[in-house]
């Protein structure tokens, strides 16, 4: 179900992980990473899309893409900004079941800091909100369930081939003619009468293009791959960085249920066991001009009893070193909750390159966090940490005795002898990891020198070949990419139908 990727070892982040490598989960399943993500439905800021359009990507302003967000959505919550949401689409959007006991105190604490309660997919982008999820009656909704399942048995022109692995796009000159793939240890070729569309995600689509001869000349030459189209494939990758070792202990205690009681609640679809991986509320803040402009930090709350990772989870899921993971032994799942800090607009640029010309070999993922020359990324995250710590001074947090207890293992000497900034910089490098949002590896744009696809997601200087996934996002958005990917797919579907005279 997961590709089992790990990012390239680093000296600037993931310092608490085995071999200083972040784990990098990607969905190896029908439906992709939407089957394994946290299901957050977030469109990001309208100005993100206006920037796409002003950068030369005609047709991608927020006004122009909003109908495609609305088209696929079926919102099932009671209070939302009307005019921004759809009610008849296949993709359900809902809240999880009842709030935890620390939910309302978090809202009130943020309000004391000047934030207002918002529909973050509506007219406001700065504020605090419950998380809108792709959930259908406490069950995950994703691209396979919402879009594919209803039509799979009734569409005569649709065939889904499972357990098949694409290894090359077949090119004749500059024209894509088909795809070569492997299934059950045998090679097959399928020819395309009209187009080949890659939707393998921000990691696998660039790998497939490069092994097919489309990519940076020096990278292809390095692996003795014939250069058929020189484009910056795999370059310009950006990802949201997350710091999650900010733990509070309060006097609000989650019910300590028996195994039988928990099983009964699970069968009935009741939280917290059917909650969205422990995520509940979000706040979007601007650390530089509070209350104004665009968000640069997202705060995510994770309440009891799923609010803190245990040692085993930290090792298996996040690849933490067994010594560093001891910090999680000191947390109590019944009383402790976490607030994650997410960097929304990073300046650091990563890449996807090849390990070899063999498409079976994993690609090389270089996240390159905290590498920007002015240290703006790590400083912004530090300001986000300070904001979270300041919540403990609010009346709302004092009322539940919410006390910060997070222990930044490996940075103790700096706490004693260094500055506060040095201490938290160390902690950020030690415990920060990915929130699994890689984008822009096959980004959209006008110039073949700076981008891979045009505004219709057609690969530059190539005929009959498109990429439609998070890789085409021109520049990282200030939010979770799942909803924008659905929007991109809806919009390009119309482009394709228009081109072939079917719309």
Question: Which sequence ranges carry the predicted segments?
Answer:
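N-terminal redox-cofactor-binding region of secreted/periplasmic oxidoreductases
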Residues: 1-503
């Amino acid at each position: 179900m997961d590709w089992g990727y790990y990012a390239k070892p680093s000296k600037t982040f993931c310092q608490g992980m085995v071999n200083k490598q972040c784990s990098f989960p990607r969905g190896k399943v029908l439906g992709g990473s939407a089957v394994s993500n946290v299901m957050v439905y977030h469109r990001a800021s309208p100005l993100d899309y206006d920037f796409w359009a002003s950068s030369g990507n005609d047709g991608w302003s927020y006004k122009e893409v909003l109908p495609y967000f609305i088209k696929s959505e079926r919102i099932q919550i009671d209070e939302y900004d009307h005019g921004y949401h759809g009610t008849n689409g296949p993709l359900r959007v809902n809240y999880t079941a009842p709030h935890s006991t620390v939910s309302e105190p978090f809202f009130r604490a943020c309000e004391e800091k000047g934030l207002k309660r918002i529909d973050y997919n509506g007219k406001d982008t700065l504020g605090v909100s419950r998380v809108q999820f792709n959930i259908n009656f406490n069950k995950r909704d994703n691209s396979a369930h919402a879009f594919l399942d209803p039509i799979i048995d009734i569409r005569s022109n649709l065939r889904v081939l499972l357990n098949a692995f694409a290894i090359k796009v077949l090119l004749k000159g500059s024209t894509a003619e088909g795809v070569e793939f492997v299934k059950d240890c045998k090679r097959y070729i399928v020819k395309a009468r009209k187009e080949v569309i890659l939707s393998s995600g921000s990691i696998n689509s660039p790998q497939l293009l490069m092994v097919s001869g489309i990519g940076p000349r020096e990278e292809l030459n390095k692996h003795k791959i014939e250069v058929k189209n020189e484009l910056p494939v795999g370059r310009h990758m950006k990802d949201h960085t997350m710091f999650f070792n900010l733990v509070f202990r309060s006097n609000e205690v989650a019910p300590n249920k028996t195994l039988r009681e928990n099983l009964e609640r699970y069968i009935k679809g009741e939280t917290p066991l059917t909650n969205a991986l422990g995520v509940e509320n979000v706040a979007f803040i601007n650390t530089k001009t509070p209350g104004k402009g665009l968000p640069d930090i997202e705060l995510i709350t994770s309440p009891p009893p799923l609010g803190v990772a245990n040692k085993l989870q930290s090792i298996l899921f996040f690849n933490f070193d067994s010594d560093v993971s001891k910090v999680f032994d000191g947390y109590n799942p019944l009383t402790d909750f976490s607030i994650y800090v997410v960097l929304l607009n990073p300046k650091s640029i990563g890449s996807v390159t090849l390990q070899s010309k063999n498409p079976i070999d994993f690609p090389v993922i270089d996240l390159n966090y905290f590498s920007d020359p002015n240290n703006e990324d790590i400083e912004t995250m530090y300001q986000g940490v300070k904001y979270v710590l300041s919540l403990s001074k609010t009346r709302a947090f004092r009322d539940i005795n919410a006390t910060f207890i997070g222990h930044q293992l490996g940075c103790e000497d700096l706490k004693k002898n260094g500055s506060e900034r040095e201490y938290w910089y160390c902690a950020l490098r030690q415990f920060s990891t990915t929130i699994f949002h890689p984008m822009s590896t096959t980004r959209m744009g006008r110039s073949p020198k700076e981008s891979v696809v045009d505004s219709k997601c057609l690969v530059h200087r190539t005929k009959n070949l498109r990429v439609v996934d998070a890789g085409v996002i021109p520049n990282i958005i200030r939010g979770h990419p799942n909803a924008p990917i659905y929007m991109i797919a809806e919009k390009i579907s119309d482009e394709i139908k228009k081109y072939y005279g079917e719309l």
